[in-house]
Amino acid sequence: MGCEHAQAAGGQTSPSQFEENTLSEVKRVIAVLSGKGGVGKSFVTGAIATELARRGHKVGVLDADITGPSIPKMFGMSGRHVHALGNLMLPEISEHGVKVMSSNLLLQNETDPVLWRGPVIAGAIRQFWSETSWGPVDYLLVDMPPGTGDVALTVFQSLPVDGIVIVTSPQDLVSMIVAKAVNMAEKMNVPILGIVENMSYIECPDCGKKIEVFGKSKLPEVAERYNLDILGQLPINPALAEACDKGEVETALPDGMLPKAVSAVEAITPHETDEA
């Protein structure tokens, strides 16, 4: 597979290094990134994946948050395990057709800790890309580990990432986190599609007024400073959080959530796929 981002500075990768097996035809790869944990990055990944699938696209999620995976549980895959096809792994498929590969699908029990060092984690992410039979996929979303460290670098050097969605929350040090993400994106020559702010407010059940529990959002100022699009601001929604814990994100997610984010992902031009 070739990619226009292959001439990235600060960790240059040639197209030939994006190893893809002959049973995978992934057209676009989108990384969902946050500066720290606890901001709902995995939920945003799941929401975008669900909405893309509802629009008729073939969707996959590569869970690169190896030590803190939550994607399988969100998509109702607790207790399920990946199977093999020759030397390749087969992703698990959700009720509504979203393909998922995650470290939790390799463990005997989903509560077992993943006590792997950095190089092993990096190797697992590369295997999730090159040794998984993804089949035809229009959009592969990568649920990144928190931060912009070694594991994030592994993703950008091992996968032909076409765009980045940044997830923040109002209590984040938004400016610093966005600055780090922007710097990484520039060094890896990958465009940032925009920012999603999660937990922006809570809606009063009586009058519908938006209450900013964590204070006034700084997102508009930060987005303007770095010339980034705001892709959405999501409320705190306890019912939806409970549905994710029950593995019901695909049925519980309101129709039309994050329309700007989904449209930004859809607007990415597919890169050429070459048989390995």
Regions found by a protein language model. Name each.
Residues 21-27:
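Phosphate-binding P-loop
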